[in-house]
Amino acid sequence: MRVLVIEDNEDFRKLALTWFQSYGIEVEGAANGAQGLALQRARPADVIVTDIFMPEMEGIETIHDLRKEFPEAKIIAMSGRDPLANLDVFEVARQVGAAKTFSKPFKFEDLIAAVRELSGAKEQRAP
């Protein structure tokens, strides 16, 4: 299984890459939506995890463009904004193609479970 993480916060992106790798999941990271689209075109991921609020190309636009080019893409949207404020933006994210949404902070194990569910992969515990 291969995962693409699109996240502008470098610390969070590096942490996510480390977590996915610890579960034996091949992962690549992008700092914004434009980079994410380029990586998806070059080496399509099974699941894409994207932040919603990013500079250059916001997550909603990224999800829309990913869905347009990759209609079968499995996409998870996440946001660190206030959970109540996220309700509306998560609804829009689902309307444009996100299968699941997460409010930061979240348990990384829950994200792993969602990625595995969407990809159809069997569970593997971190060492």
Question: Could you say what each language-model-derived stretch is?
Answer:
Residues 7:
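Conserved acidic carboxylate
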Residues 61, 82-102, 109:
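Alpha4 helix (beta4-alpha4-beta5 surface) of REC/receiver domains from two-component response regulators
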Residues 38, 60-72:
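Short amphipathic alpha-helix used as the core "switch/output" element in two-component signaling
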Residues 54:
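Receiver (REC) domain active-site loop signature in two-component systems and cognate sites
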Residues 29-38, 59:
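Helix N-cap/capping motif at the beta->alpha junctions
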